[in-house]
From Swiss-Prot:
Gene name per UniProt: fosB
InterPro entries registered for this protein in UniProt: Fosfomycin_Res_Enzymes, Glyas_Bleomycin-R_OHBP_Dase, Glyas_Fos-R_dOase_dom, Metallothiol_Trafse_FosB, VOC
EC number(s) reported in the record: 2.5.1.-
Every VOC domain range: 5-120
Organism: Geobacillus thermodenitrificans (strain NG80-2)
Similarity annotation: Belongs to the fosfomycin resistance protein family. FosB subfamily.
Record-given protein name: Metallothiol transferase FosB
Keywords: Antibiotic resistance, Cytoplasm, Magnesium, Metal-binding, Transferase
Protein's UniProt keywords contain Transferase: yes
Localization per record: Cytoplasm
A Pfam cross-reference name: Glyoxalase
Catalytic residues, chain numbering: 116 (proton donor/acceptor)
Native organism taxonomy: Bacteria, Bacillati, Bacillota, Bacilli, Bacillales
UniProt-annotated binding residues for Mg(2+): 8, 67, 116
Subunit structure: Homodimer.
First-listed, main subcellular location of the protein, grouped into a coarse class: cytoplasm
Amino acid sequence: MRIGGINHLTFSVSDLEKSIHFYQNVFGAKLLVKGRNLAYFDLNGIWLALNVQQDIPRNDIQHSYTHIAFSVKEEDFDHVVEKLKELGVNILPGRERDERDKRSVYFTDPDGHKFEFHTGTLNDRLSYYKSEMHHMQFFD
């Protein structure tokens, strides 16, 4: 069996209009369709879906490190963080990191889904870990 790339991302939201505004303004997502309880976007070739669900627990996952990270260019990072602040986005305290691990900002959408904008790549991370994390086992 061969699995392809990610097909789509779906998030349960409590307020469709508020969430549409968030994803358009924070991510620059292009709204493709909007129904009573759903919205679909194109996010740089990723199918992003929002589905309204009112009565579900929303706070538990916020306490974990579970998140989705998107790449941003190093030269755009400060501007991206400033834009999040201007939009009133809930920015989370970041974890301490070595500069070789590049830069990140963590934030949530209106329903608490956690995201990260990160300037590094997987190769950056592996290179850093190989030089510093001698307890780790690496595979080809």
